[in-house]
Amino acid sequence: MEIDGNTLVFIIVILFLFFSSPGGDGVSSQYEFNQLQRLKQQFRTEHNTFVNMTYTDSFRNITGLKLSYQDMLNNPLQNATYPLPGKDYDRWFPNQNYMVLPNDVIEAINTEVWNTSNDDASNLFPPNITSTLLGKIDLVSNNKYEKIRMPVPRFYEPATDFSEDIPPEGETYWSEWPSYGELHNVSFQHGEIAIQISHMSNLQDNNNYLRRNFINKKNDRWKLLNLQIDFSDKAEKEKHSIYSKAVYDIQRGRILSISQSSKFHSLFALPHYMSFQNDYNEKIFNDVKELVDEFWNFTDYTDVMTMKDVQDAYNNANFKCEYLIFLQLEPWNQYTRDQIKLIDDELNWPLGRPANLSSLPPINVVSGLLYSPDCGVRLGLHNVKGTRYELKIMSIRKHLLFGIALFAAQIYLLLTQMHHTNTPSMVNKISFYCFSMINLVDGSLATLYFVAASVVPELYLPLVISAFSCFILASIFEIRYLISIYASQVNEQNVGIINLLRGNTGTYDENRPRPAFIPDEGSIGGSLYGRFFFMLIIFTFLILSSTSWPRQLRMVFEYILIFILNSYWIPQIFRNAVKGIPSRRERARSSIGGNRSQNKMPLLWSFVIGTTIIRSLPVVYVFTYSSNVFRHHKDVHFVVFLSLWLLFQISILYSQDVLGSRWFLPKHTIPDGYSYFKPLSNEYISEHGGGTAEHTVDCAICMSDVPIYIEEIPETHKVDQHSYMVTPCNHVFHTSCLENWMNYKLQCPVCRSPLPPL
């Protein structure tokens, strides 16, 4: 087999990209290798200092902890060097002389957040607090406290030249923060906060992707947590995020979390900052120190570091404030220890235990405080609570199962609608854009379900089933229906909306010669599938990107989009007006004595009502139920407005069914379509010949005589003009014969010219 030059170049490029990609640690140059080694060495040195530290020792050469709050009061321009002249490193007290917190913040933590009432041994707190907590956050002060100088080591800086191999020495002090909005300050007075709590019980090795269960020696007393904290003003114009590790004191319900970056190695500060009280300080210090050391050894902390850790730490140091977070949980004194254990076992492994999960109280933060030592910002929390993660997963699973039932109902309704319009003439009356809008929503839902299945492993099975059901509905049934609609209307593509809406007192000229175009459903299907997937990708990316927009812009986009996507009956109303469907009384009159099934309304009322209800239920749930799983705000007024809008569309469809599809338009606004029922002239008989009887012609389908109405011959005026049909190509057939023929083909049986639908 010969390989041309282009193929060879392509193979070489692919092999180059494959073999030149960074390894498991992300290092792609000697400079980055030295950066990573410097970072690992720095952490190893500081860990050795941490291991030798006792409760009575102060912090020594640990990044971000070299200066106390009192040091900054003494000299606001003090550099973070070690050792500081005259500073005693062999003593430790929980005050501003040794901590990065001012005394009034320490006092607030001791009296308002971690008060002594929580030391009562009778208090019981849940050992598992995995959840998402939502609440309010208030600014206490952003200009009262002195800012502690926290330099960033220069070896974190990216290389400025490809020839560089050695990262620079020294540290960088930011005299003025980069002007990137409000990243280094909090300017709003009141806002909203979301705290995602997860236990560090299942850790993953960054190199070999092995997961191992991390269980510390005092697992019943202490827990290591991962915290993701996001807070912003109500309009979401100013957003802040914190990703940090935390220590959870199960006996006292206290949580301490400290952010970490290249300017603040907070992991080594957890033991000292957890021991605030006068009683058991040293014991708490030793327990937390042992917990941190176990985590360090279990994860091979420095060995698994990658260049991503270097870049993330550097970006966090440049663009974010460091925060210390102190939280106090509400006790669950209504339960015993055995009951709490039973609840945890049932949530982790549901077996039907008598745990009464429906009355399980939320994880409630009764008091909380956030303080930033390098930005001098103090924040307070209130009304922060949330349900257990397992309960939330159970609730979402029920919602997904209900959604699957809705998809099944929608598939059933669509199949009945397809059976109702099982002829080309009936399909021709369906609006292509009506079902395109419905199809776009269903296809996007399928894509979002597939994305969510990879993000939430606990819901993988119901999400995949939902995605599969929605994908079948969108890509098989709805696309197949759209292909039939498009194929039946392909000969109308030259008839634009402007032409249809122009004023015309005449009849639309169906007699002009047109090419006999036979639609190929294979090519139409390929075109529609390509368009479907393209629109699906664009629309899905638009929806996902909108979640990160400011709230006001996001709400405007959301409301407009929902309104447009719930206007799916408008194209069908327009299509009905274009096709000129007669009123119900006229349809009943014309059906007497003949097969006039083609005059039926194109949409079944069961399909219209059922589809409207099915597609309205999710919107009603999200906008009216304040505890919805999407954490969406409540807006009953919008639901009422949307319901009235849908009711208006259905009312117009019903009025078209009763009064005729053009009742609201002036006469002759839209040209009349071709009429198959018309008298013939004497010239027609002379040109096309007659049948075996006088004043008749032969029906090419049944080969029988067709009596016809001839204008010039009065004795033929007794013939019912609806008993025969005249095609645009001037061929005459029995009405029943041609209607049955047009159930399968919209082509003349004689000359194969395209026929306008009934």
Swiss-Prot record:
Pfam families attached to this UniProt entry: DUF2921, zf-rbx1
Keywords associated with the record: Golgi apparatus, Membrane, Metal-binding, Signal, Transferase, Transmembrane, Transmembrane helix, Ubl conjugation pathway, Zinc, Zinc-finger
Gene3D superfamilies on file: Zinc/RING finger domain, C3HC4 (zinc finger) (3.30.40.10)
Broad class of where this protein is predominantly found: Golgi
Signal sequence annotation: 1-26
Source organism superkingdom: Eukaryota
UniProt xrefs under InterPro entries: DUF2921, HRD1_E3_ubiq-ligases, Znf_RING, Znf_RING/FYVE/PHD, Znf_RING_H2
Disulphide bridges: none
Pathway: Protein modification; protein ubiquitination
Any one GO MF annotation of this record: zinc ion binding
EC category name: transferase
Zn finger region (RING-type): 699-752
EC assignment: 2.3.2.27
Lumenal topological domain: 27-398, 453-458, 545-553, 624-635
Bilayer topology term: Multi-pass membrane protein
Record-annotated membrane-spanning stretches: 399-419, 432-452, 459-479, 524-544, 554-574, 603-623, 636-656
Catalytic reaction(s) noted: S-ubiquitinyl-[E2 ubiquitin-conjugating enzyme]-L-cysteine + [acceptor protein]-L-lysine = [E2 ubiquitin-conjugating enzyme]-L-cysteine + N(6)-ubiquitinyl-[acceptor protein]-L-lysine
Keyword DNA-binding found: no
Localization in the cell: Golgi apparatus membrane
GO cellular component, one term: endomembrane system
GO biological process, one term: ubiquitin-dependent protein catabolic process
Cytoplasmic compartment segments: 420-431, 480-523, 575-602, 657-758
Function statement: Catalytic component of the DSC E3 ubiquitin ligase complexes that tag proteins present in Golgi, endosome and vacuole membranes and function in protein homeostasis under non-stress conditions and support a role in protein quality control. Mediates ubiquitination of vacuolar proteins such as CPS1, PPN1, PEP12 and other proteins containing exposed hydrophilic residues within their transmembrane domains, leading to their sorting into internal vesicles in late endosomes. Targets also the unpalmitoylated endosomal SNARE TLG1 to the MVB pathway.
Record's subunit section: Component of the DSC E3 ligase complexes composed of at least TUL1, DSC2, DSC3, UBX3, CDC48 as well as VLD1 for the vacuole-localized complex or GLD1 for the Golgi/endosome-localized complex. Interacts with UBC4.
The name this protein goes by in its record: Transmembrane E3 ubiquitin-protein ligase 1
Lineage, top ranks: Eukaryota, Fungi, Dikarya, Ascomycota, Saccharomycotina
